[in-house]
């Protein structure tokens, strides 16, 4: 069986509202289980592909600061 993870994740949330999307993200992060990381990666990939250069720069700055706090 060839499971296309990207397609499965997108299909699973395709009709979700903003609030439902937020709940999905927050729940996955709070649970802290590694099994949710691929799905979060797919969501981030979609955010990245649909963001402006300015938004990408802001995300990168935020990410840089966040990872430095954990170093």
UniProtKB/Swiss-Prot annotation:
Induction: Expressed only in the forespore compartment of sporulating cells.
UniProt record, GO biological process: asexual sporulation; sporulation resulting in formation of a cellular spore
Superkingdom of the organism of origin: Bacteria
Keywords assigned: Sporulation
Any one Pfam family match given in the protein's UniProt record, by short name: SSPI
Keyword Disulfide bond belongs to the record: no
Cell location: Spore core
HAMAP family assigned: SspI (MF_00669)
Family, similarity comment: Belongs to the SspI family.
Protein name: Small, acid-soluble spore protein I
Annotated gene: sspI
């Amino acid at each position: 069986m060839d499971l296309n993870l990207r397609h499965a994740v997108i299909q699973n949330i395709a009709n979700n509202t903003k609030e439902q999307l937020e709940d999905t993200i927050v729940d996955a992060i709070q649970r802290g289980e590694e099994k949710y990381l691929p799905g979060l990666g797919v969501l981030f990939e979609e955010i990245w592909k649909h963001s402006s250069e300015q938004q990408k720069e802001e995300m990168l700055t935020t990410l840089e600061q966040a990872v430095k706090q954990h170093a």
